[in-house]
A protein has these predicted regions:
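Short alpha-helical donor nucleotide-sugar binding micro-motif in glycosyltransferases
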Residues: 172, 291, 299-304
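Carbohydrate-associated surface elements
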Residues: 184, 205
Length: 409
């Protein structure tokens, strides 16, 4: 099968600079590699966002990357918003159509809403089925933001979200099929008018060869270790975790993510969080690592007794899944992918957000029972390997492709 994977603002060839340890670019590379391993030809179409990125390149056998010039590279933000991407959709979709007219794919898979807009425009009249995957829905983001409205560091609606809110339902209804990354997203898509029969749940996967219980472990200092991965912008959930830490004696917290370590002193969010930790009297038990490269995450995750998710909205729960794959139980809020991935009381704990006293109680209970943590860790590894390996995700993705190509025949 010839697969066209449209990812306007992601490329497995040249991952964007970013503050988080889990990037869409990396997952995209894993998915395409597994699809190619099963004998399919994959072409990733991405927007050229750096001057030194080649127009064409082979990622690995069976996977080619095409970077499309959709305007001046200098005008593309490092983390572009809706307005930046929407403005470039026509310049992105035109070349796509020309390429597909001469080299027609069997199926198109679009990642994110602007990619879907470009893919649908390019595939129009060519008879190519389009599979849409939103990765993140504005309706869910706005719901998460509403829960923390007017609180510092809360998720805020994108400046161009009006266009996104208006267009996401139309994109979902126009696609041949829609891939949801978690169960809650199915209900959100249905509320937008997307027919449930066209929706299939295919979560984001985990590299179970890299994220394993066995392997190097980051150095510890004798204290029980808690870890959270965040870009530091969502301060309110982090403040909740810091408050909980005051009631968990002799435990340390690693805050992984944000700008590079050398740039932390110049980061406003870091400064406010570090000051807050000092005010609480726990600065000596809180370490901000700054940005950590993807390959360096497994040793850190293995070194933690527990990983706590502080995300207000997390469609895929990627870092939580990575922790579980390393045998580290997760404490997470009941949002997005966590509701599917974390089995409450078996692989970790689901806990309501903004409840520092309850969080502290749960942390103390678990840290006082190392054997329970170990049991959760064993179950977590089994959960990830059986449900979230990229081999399985690729197989489920191909099942969606087979369905839409059969219907289009």
């Amino acid at each position: 099968m010839k697969i066209a994977l449209v990812a306007q603002n992601a490329t497995p060839l040249h991952p964007r600079a970013g503050s988080g340890p889990d990037r869409d670019d990396i997952g995209l590379g894993e998915l395409t590699r597994k699809l190619a391993d099963q004998g399919h030809q994959v072409t990733v179409y991405a927007q050229k966002n750096l001057a030194d990125v080649p127009d064409q390149a082979e990622l690995h056998a069976g996977v080619r990357v095409e970077h499309i010039d959709a305007g001046p590279v200098a005008g593309i933000a490092t983390e572009p918003g809706d307005a930046d991407l929407l403005e470039r959709v026509p310049a992105f979709s035109g070349p796509l159509r020309s390429l597909w007219e001469s080299d027609r794919p069997d199926v198109v898979h679009a990642l994110a809403w602007t990619s879907g807009l470009a893919a649908l425009a390019a595939a129009r009249d060519l008879g190519i089925p389009v599979v849409q995957e939103f990765s993140s829905l504005s309706v869910a983001e706005r719901r998460a933001a509403a829960g923390f409205r007017d609180q510092p560091g809360a998720v805020k609606a994108d400046g161009a979200s009006a266009a996104r809110i208006r267009l996401e339902p139309a994109i979902g209804r126009s696609a041949s099929a829609v891939v949801a990354t978690n169960s809650a997203e199915v209900s959100d898509l249905a509320s937008l008018g997307v027919h449930r029969s066209s929706i299939r749940i295919v979560p984001w996967g985990v590299d179970t060869d890299l994220f394993t219980p066995e392997g190097p472990v980051a150095k510890r200092n004798g204290r029980q270790r808690l870890l959270t991965a965040t870009d530091l912008t969502q301060r309110k959930p982090l403040e909740t975790l810091l408050r909980a830490l005051t009631k968990v004696s002799d435990a340390e917290l690693l805050v992984v993510g944000g700008p590079a370590e050398a740039e932390l002193p110049r980061d406003d969010n870091y400064a406010k969080l570090a000051k807050f930790a000092a005010t609480l009297g726990i600065a000596d038990r809180v370490t901000f690592t700054g940005k950590v490269e993807y390959a360096a995450m497994p040793p850190l995750l293995r070194s933690a007794d527990l990983v706590i998710s502080t995300c207000q909205y997390e469609p895929s729960g990627t870092t939580s899944l990575q922790a579980m794959a390393c045998g580290t139980p997760v404490i997470a809020p009941p949002v997005g992918g966590h509701m599917d991935a974390v089995v409450d009381g078996t692989t970790g704990i689901i806990i309501p957000p903004d409840r520092p006293a309850l969080l502290a109680q749960r942390l103390r209970q678990l840290l006082a029972h190392p054997m329970l943590i170990e049991a959760y860790g064993v179950a977590a590894v089994d959960r990830v390997r059986s449900r979230y390996s990229w081999d399985r995700i690729a197989g489920e993705t191909l099942a969606v492709y087979d369905r839409v190509t059969t219907q289009a025949a």
